A protein has these predicted regions:
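Short, contiguous acidic/charged loop-to-helix segments that flank catalytic cores in large enzymes
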Residues: 116, 141-147, 169-175
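Right-handed parallel beta-helix
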Residues: 1-11, 24-41, 53-77, 85-91, ...
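Extracellular beta-strand solenoids
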Residues: 16, 45, 89, 119-120, ...
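Acidic, glycine- and Ser/Thr-rich low-complexity intrinsically disordered tracts
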Residues: 59, 151, 155, 162, ...
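Non-catalytic carbohydrate-binding regions of carbohydrate-active enzymes
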Residues: 137-141, 162, 166
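Short, solvent-exposed loop/turn segments at secondary-structure boundaries
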Residues: 18, 54-58, 170
């Protein structure tokens, strides 16, 4: 469990696993953290090699939960080849125990990245009820890294991005794998709202249109608590300065 930390200006905020995938990270809980202005990742969970038979290491399907965090790279991040997303999630075990493990992210705020996407992931993922704002580029990239995206659900998120809102690139899945990447019920204001995946019931509009729509109250509260600003998107809202839910 990683809970209630403030990490400001680090090289990498949270790094879980090992660069070669040899350090198991299983069934974690990461919640109520503020991670801002890192040089590299706010959070990186490395890909996993097949799970070793170690006493005490959970077997079967496990879920890692990432919830109620703020991940921001508004300042201080690397550019060029050294640029990194706010959050990168690697794949789980490719065979044996852990192949059905999933990483679930909900209730998080992903805020600004001048040089990269806000989120990148592969493996088994579920992203729901998060808020993404990037004035500079992409929000969500589901794409191969050390393996491929497997079963992925991007559901009910609010996304404002100058670049692509949700990008899905599947890579080459094993024959008969039947992996599915679903993009469902999101509200997306972006230069290119959705590119790839099985898309349904999404509300999409150009990036600039976000200025005319109210944002959720909880998003305003989360951002203002950490002294961020969404006034760019609120300045032209024809709703008397109110937010959704008031």
């Amino acid at each position: 469990m990683i809970r209630g930390n403030e990490i400001v200006g680090a090289g990498t905020g949270l790094y879980l696993g090992n660069s070669d995938g040899s350090a198991p990270f299983v069934g974690g809980l990461i919640e109520h953290n503020l991670v801002v202005d890192t040089i590299g990742y706010n959070l990186q969970i490395k890909h996993q090699r097949p799970r070793p038979d170690v006493p005490g290491l959970p077997a079967g399907k496990n879920v890692t939960i990432i919830r109620y965090n703020v991940f921001s790279k508004a300042r201080g991040g690397s550019s060029g080849p050294a640029a990194r997303p706010n959050v990168l999630i690697g794949h789980g075990s490719l065979y044996g125990p852990g192949t059905d493990d999933v990483t679930v992210l909900y209730g998080n705020v992903f805020h600004q990245n001048p040089a990269e996407a806000l989120f990148q992931g592969e493996g088994n993922l579920a992203l729901h009820g998060n808020q993404f704002v990037n004035d500079h580029g992409d929000a969500i990239r589901i794409q191969p890294h050390n393996d491929i995206p497997r079963n992925v659900d991007v559901l009910g998120n609010t996304i404002v991005a100058e670049g692509t809102g949700v990008l899905v690139r599947t890579g080459e899945a094993p024959a008969g794998a039947g992996f599915r990447q679903a993009v469902t019920g999101n509200v997306v204001f972006a230069g290119r709202p959705i590119d790839g995946g099985v898309s349904s019931a999404n509300t999409v509009a150009p990036f600039e249109a976000a200025a005319y729509y109210p944002v959720p109250c909880d998003f305003q509260f989360a951002i203002s608590n950490f002294q961020f600003s969404i006034r760019r998107f609120a300045s032209k809202r024809p709703v008397g300065g109110r937010c959704l839910g008031e």
